[in-house]
Amino acid sequence: MSTILMASQQDPVDLWRDSLAKEMPELGFRAYPDVGDPGDIDYALVYWAPHGLIASLPNVRAVFSIAAGCDHVLADPQLPPHLPIVRMVDDYLAAMMAEYALYGVLHFHRGMHYYRREQLAARWNRAWPLYTPDTAVGILGLGAIGGDCARKLGALGFQVHGWSRGPKKMDGVTCHHGPDGLLEMAGQCRYLVCVLPLTSETQGIINSELIAAMPQGGYIINIARGGHQVDEDLLAALDSGHLGGIFLDVYNQEPLPPEHPYWRHDKVWITPHVAGELVPRSCAKSVAANIRRFEAGAPVPDLFDKSRGY
């Protein structure tokens, strides 16, 4: 019987234990700090695990990330370099992220930011609506989450563009790639939604150059990682009027410090990194399926690729 060790400072241990038991009753489960014999552990299920914990497990075969990204795993300087890391790829997580992206786009598209200001001033004013079929949304990142966002925004009638590092094809989406394609897409889109993985290539991608390429009065929604955005460039574009507003769920420093100007800026809407919450009942299916693949010696489709950074 294989055993998995869970180590997370924020995820519900009992829900994970029960959910994994439903999907894989034969799997042993332990939760840090109750490791027991480290040699018993075959798999680690982690989110910001204590540094050195994974290296202390002599027989661990793989690390499962309790997040779509793997930056928290890679932050451990003692992480064994040969160890496979499995990304959390979950349909329900992708659906939640897409819900948030749609909400962010529709918030601005239907003028909710304007109507909130008018409500607080007790003014009965109407804004003329935009024609959705003439309005373009750009998705930065066309993986599982970006693809779901693109399909659902397309179903609402928007023109949908997507950008990725390399060439891609997706039905109903005008696809762009590479540095030139990024600015080309930005120039056509009123709204940009970032769902990229954070890598050395995408760090700071939401910067003054990208913003300047957008039409006057555009909007940005970032639900990926705070490291994608250059805060000073966003604030400057908001204050100049080049950007009409931003909707952020992620930040360069989390929790967002109380003194940060985002809290009080009237063109900024913020939430505390909640766009995609991992629900154990759904994610346990993915974890169990991939453990079975490891046990059978079968290919694991959700492995983190260190050469690509995601």
Regions found by a protein language model. Give the residues of each.
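N-terminal glycine-/charge-rich "phosphate-binding" loop or analogous flexible N-terminal tail
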Residues: 1-41
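Phosphate/diphosphate ligand-binding glycine-rich loop within oxidoreductases
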Residues: 42-116
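Oxidoreductase and adenylate-handling cofactor-binding alpha/beta cores
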Residues: 98-114, 155-156, 286-294, 298
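Glycine-rich NAD(P)-binding loop of Rossmann-like domains
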Residues: 115-148, 175
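Rossmann-like adenosine-cofactor binding region
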Residues: 167-261
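Rossmann-like dinucleotide-binding domain for NAD(H)/NADP(H)
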Residues: 217, 223-310
